[in-house]
Amino acid sequence: MSGKHPLVQAIENSQLKTDLPEFAPGDTVVVQVKVKEGDRERLQAFEGVVIAKKNRGLNSAFTVRKISSGVGVERVFQTHSPVVAKIEVKRRGDVRRAKLYYLRDLSGKAARIREKLPARKA
């Protein structure tokens, strides 16, 4: 049980998104972000590897890292934010850590992640 007031808990539960896919650190995802430019709004895609995930109910967040023109770019997204329009899992990664911060020090082929293969049917 969380130490939150039942009213606060009820309001937070009403704000949670339910259409989110299952994803984990190591997965390659495309995050569609709503960007407001002047009076119009458009979707901007941010594709990269999930290097960290923080599960805290409404305060859940995840960090995505990509290499853009030779420079590493990391962006932290609030999972249930209205700014995040859609999350699409491109590739499942097979990793043994919950936080992949060691990828910050690796570049090129060393930073590759094995793909998780679907479970075999017995």
Curated annotation (Swiss-Prot):
GO terms, molecular function: structural constituent of ribosome
Q: Name the source's superkingdom.
A: Bacteria
Q: Which GO terms describe its cellular component?
A: cytosolic large ribosomal subunit
- Which Pfam families does this entry report, sorted A to Z? Ribosomal_L19
Tell me the keywords, alphabetical order.
Ribonucleoprotein, Ribosomal protein
One GO BP? translation
List the InterPro entries hit by this protein, alphabetically. Ribosomal_bL19, Ribosomal_bL19_CS, Ribosomal_bL19_sf, Translation_prot_SH3-like_sf
Say which family it is in.
Belongs to the bacterial ribosomal protein bL19 family.
- Role summary: This protein is located at the 30S-50S ribosomal subunit interface and may play a role in the structure and function of the aminoacyl-tRNA binding site.
Q: What is this protein called?
A: Large ribosomal subunit protein bL19
Question: What species was this sequence derived from?
Answer: Acinetobacter baumannii (strain AB0057)
